[in-house]
């Protein structure tokens, strides 16, 4: 395969294959070969490719996943004879670090929570690092203390810091009394104004957290080094080591750096885990700027030509999916297909139950209530139509919850139809594949006896088509049991949105001075990152930032459109037209609220504005007018 990639006239690959694949005897990164030798690069579904490129250069991993992965190899190591363990000290040290990891995670989590509780968590509500925390208190402590902490952060000078031995005790045990005592004594000498001052407790707790985070950063790096030194391959290769080892060195030679610099940070998850993430580069440049990533001596671009293909990449305002490139050609669907789509029935069920936005601990219960309310409509659809039905949720676990509830409801009503839940390709536990289908095999759903598929929005929006032997969609109806939106505080998604925001700004940027442009990028990216952090704390009903709100609405539209596209694979326009049900009550604002986030109304306004735009409306009308015609006819709008 590697030889063919170098000699073939046509190479078909994935995003990861293009960026990270290696070819030839020298194992050269395939991206280098493509930039140097390819005449043209076609990107299919370029809006999704754009998102995947940004995602690829923002690796993230949960520390507890590393701990879970360590369980078996560490157990095997402990079952060895002492002679065998002594025979490979490098592997023994790696095992020591692995075994110590649960204690370190508990200590870091406790330090984060202690700092959060002392100041209502404003700085710690989102992503943070030792640097950002120190910056937040720099005006409240002496310059000498700031310099001492910076000395501790620097790997070259850390051991010369008077805080080094104290830091070494920070994650020694979950009983942190000794560490806290030593640090308190140090602070009493250096920062007497903090002593016995109730108003300064938050500052002391932040310093304690900063010292703990510095230790944690060193500990994570030490794990990577220990793995490299270990010669025992049975100790395993895991996600954390992959996270540490990933440098994208060759790729960064071509790409602009991350917009805020090579960002590194951590985040405390809802399960008290620590999420680590980095952003290495501006990934979408490989999509929109590939011809300019290789130039001759005169500065003329000589990189590959690029053809971008997608039916949903023109969605202004969506920082994930809108591709900031001029549209040169539109392949318009046949009139009969446009009419078929325009005759779709859109219906909202008007349920009071609100799945999206409900407390996590109650969400499954609310989802089951929605399934109960929808069961009669589902049975009616099965009776009235020959096609199959898609039920859309937000996760694989929700898919199982819905499938189980619907099966139980069918039994009560004497309905013999079968229900199939989509599961991850990584899931190895499910055995009864009459009730489950893997994501990578979803195209086979047409061959299954089951007429109902329950699937997460992000798992079903793209990829394999579910069609009959004639290529016509097997699906005739879709029920949105949830409001399809991303996770508000997902750091990878936030990085993608930041890239998209700046791409939209730079598309219209006219300043030629490179220094001023770079300064503008850093400043605007940082401001927008902070805006996202601030908006993430607010409920949608109270979201005031118009650009972030428009991004949410436009991105939701693209997701709904792509899922709807599963029903619009049309080869026979005489067949039954699709029906789309909005079941989640959260698609509308609360009944008793004068103001609030009304997703269906917001989406109507967004589409109407885009289609009526004087300059680019023709593009939007060609792509989306059939959808809008059907939507406008079935959904109430104000």
Locate the predicted segments by residue.
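Short, basic/hydrophobic alpha-helical segments
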Residues: 368-384, 440-445, 570
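Conserved strand-helix element at the start of the C-terminal RecA-like helicase core
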Residues: 381-407
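N-terminal targeting/trafficking signals and adjacent low-complexity tails
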Residues: 504-544, 554, 582-638
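Conserved motor-coupling elements within RecA-like helicase/translocase cores
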Residues: 2-11, 415-455, 466-469
């Amino acid at each position: 395969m590697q030889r063919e990639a170098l000699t073939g006239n046509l190479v078909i690959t994935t995003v990861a294959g293009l960026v990270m694949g290696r070819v030839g005897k020298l194992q050269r990164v395939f991206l280098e070969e493509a930039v140097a030798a390819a005449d043209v690069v076609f990107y299919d579904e370029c809006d999704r490719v754009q998102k995947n490129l940004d995602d690829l250069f923002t690796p993230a991993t949960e520390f507890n996943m590393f701990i879970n992965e360590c369980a078996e190899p560490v157990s095997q190591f402990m079952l060895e004879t002492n002679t065998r363990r002594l025979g490979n000290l490098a592997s023994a040290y790696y095992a020591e670090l692995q075994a110590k990891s649960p204690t370190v995670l508990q200590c870091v989590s406790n330090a984060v929570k202690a700092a959060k509780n002392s100041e209502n968590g404003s700085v710690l509500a989102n992503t943070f690092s030792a640097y950002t925390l120190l910056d937040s208190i720099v005006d409240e402590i002496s310059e000498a203390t700031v310099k001492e902490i910076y000395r501790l952060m620097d790997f070259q000078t850390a051991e010369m810091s008077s805080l080094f031995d104290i830091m070494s005790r920070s994650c020694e045990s979950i009983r942190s009394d000794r560490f806290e005592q030593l640090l308190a004594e140090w602070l009493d000498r250096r920062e007497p104004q903090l002593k016995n001052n109730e108003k300064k407790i938050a500052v002391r707790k932040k310093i304690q957290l900063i010292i703990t985070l510095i230790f944690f950063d060193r500990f994570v790096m030490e794990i990577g080094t220990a793995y490299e030194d270990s010669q025992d391959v049975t100790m395993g290769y895991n996600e954390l080591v992959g996270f540490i080892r990933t440098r994208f060195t060759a790729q960064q030679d071509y790409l602009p750096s991350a917009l805020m610099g090579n960002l590194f940070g951590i985040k405390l998850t809802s399960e008290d885990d620590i999420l680590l993430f980095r952003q290495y580069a501006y990934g979408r440049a490989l999509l929109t700027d590939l011809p300019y990533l290789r130039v001759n001596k005169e500065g003329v671009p000589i990189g590959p030509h690029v053809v971008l293909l997608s039916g949903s990449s023109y969605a202004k305002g969506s920082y994930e999916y809108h591709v900031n490139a001029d549209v040169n050609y539109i392949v318009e669907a046949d009139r009969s297909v446009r009419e078929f789509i325009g005759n779709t029935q859109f219906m909202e069920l008007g349920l009071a139950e609100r799945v999206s936005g409900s407390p996590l601990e109650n969400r499954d219960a609310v989802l089951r209530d929605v399934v109960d309310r929808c069961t009669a409509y589902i049975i009616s659809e099965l009776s009235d139509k020959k096609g199959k039905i898609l039920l859309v949720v937000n996760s694989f676990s929700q898919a199982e919850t819905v499938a189980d509830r619907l099966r139980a409801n069918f039994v009560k009503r004497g309905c013999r139809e079968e229900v199939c839940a989509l599961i991850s390709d990584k899931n190895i536990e499910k055995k009864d594949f009459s009730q489950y289908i893997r994501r990578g095999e979803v195209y086979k759903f047409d061959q299954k006896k089951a007429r109902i598929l329950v699937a997460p929005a992000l798992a079903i929006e793209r990829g394999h088509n579910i069609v009959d032997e004639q290529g016509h969609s097997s699906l005739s109806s879709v029920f949105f049991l949830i409001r399809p939106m991303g996770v508000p505080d997902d750091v990878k998604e936030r990085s993608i949105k930041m890239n998209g925001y700046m791409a939209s700004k730079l598309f219209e940027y006219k300043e030629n001075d490179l220094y001023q442009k770079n300064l503008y990028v850093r400043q605007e990216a940082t401001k927008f990152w902070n805006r996202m952090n601030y908006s993430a704390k607010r409920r949608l009903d109270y979201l005031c930032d118009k650009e972030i709100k428009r991004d949410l609405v436009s991105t939701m539209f693209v997701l709904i459109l792509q899922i709807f596209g599963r029903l619009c694979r049309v080869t026979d326009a005489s067949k039954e037209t699709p029906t789309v049900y909005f079941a989640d009550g959260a698609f509308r604002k609360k009944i008793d609220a004068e103001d609030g986030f009304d997703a269906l109304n917001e989406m109507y306004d967004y589409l109407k504005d885009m289609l009526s735009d004087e300059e680019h409306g023709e593009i939007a009308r060609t792509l989306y007018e059939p959808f809008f015609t059907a939507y406008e006819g079935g959904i109430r709008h104000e």
